[in-house]
Amino acid sequence: MSAATIRAARATDQQALAALWATAFTPPLSPDQWLVDDERLAHTRVAEDDEGLCGSIYGLPKRLRESDGGIAAVHAIGSVAVAERARGQGLARRLVAATLQAAGDADWALLFTGTPEVYRSSGFETFSMARTVAGPWRAATPAAVGTEGRVVRESVGLGSLRPVREVYERSRSDLVLAPVRGDRDWAMAEVRLRGATLYRRIEGSTVVGYAVAEPRGGVGVLLESAVLPGADGARDDLLAAIAVDWASAGVTSCELAVPALPEEDRALRAFAPEAVRQDDRTGMIRPLRRAARLHGIRHFTAGDYF
């Protein structure tokens, strides 16, 4: 077998990439989110041997908030896939090097992984994040009294998150790692969250808070939520509406992606009193032009993974 060569992706690679991702990831990775990116070919590096494509890596430019109140240009790395026949040859390391060379003016690089040892030799270091609260769940009271008509439900789909954009941005101003979402980021979030329930808390004609959640078997998952500053009652109303749906679905445990803020913890003590904060160490960073500034409360939600 010849050594793999690494190059930029081409339009003719799309079918082979989908096949690679279907076998390299568990569960299989759908190309839907990648297809949203109009610049996906320029952002993707592939490895090719004499049997065809045997590896891929995706480097997406993102703007993430930092602890000094600034915004970092970040090279977000994902879809690192190596075919079975090409493993054990250092190909993942070569793919990482290739995408870093294409990072342009990015300040630093970010990835999330369950196998951090693969990336340490490329200069990446892990960091911790209190991203979720998890544990047993049960509906404590007949909630949602008075929320009917103020909390509107719909399934997440194309364009459904447009009404909540302002709420998201204003709620994330002090959260380290939280992306400043552009149109592409919002479209990708709609793909990642597709099919989950979007709960919007309405005050008059204004959205003052929202949540995206779904039951997965007996597990209730809160994927993303936000309320306008000072609208703490909206958070309680959203959780009350979610509780009604989860009770009907037979949810017995929960995983809640909420930042470690006092107002969030207060609401969760009533919603899921037995759930506890989890330490997420799947994130890794590497300096490019400079080191990342990640001091403070960190938060990154499912809609922004890449």
Where are each of the predicted segments found?
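Conserved acetyl-CoA-binding loop-helix of GNAT-fold acetyltransferases
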Residues: S79-V82, G88-Q101, D232-V244
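Amide-forming acyltransferase catalytic core, primarily the GNAT-like/NAT-type
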Residues: E125-A226
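Conserved GNAT acetyl-CoA-binding A-motif
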Residues: V96, Q101-G114, S248-A260
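Extreme N-terminal starter segment of soluble prokaryotic enzymes
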Residues: S2-I6
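Conserved beta-strand in the GNAT
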Residues: V46, G52-K62, V74-A76, A81, ...
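Active-site rim helix/loop that mediates acceptor-substrate recognition in acyltransferases
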Residues: A18-E66, V176-L198
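Long, hydrophobic, well-ordered secondary-structure blocks that form the structural core
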Residues: W108-A134
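Active-site/acyl-donor-binding loops of N-acyltransferases
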Residues: E125-P142, L223-D232, A240-F306
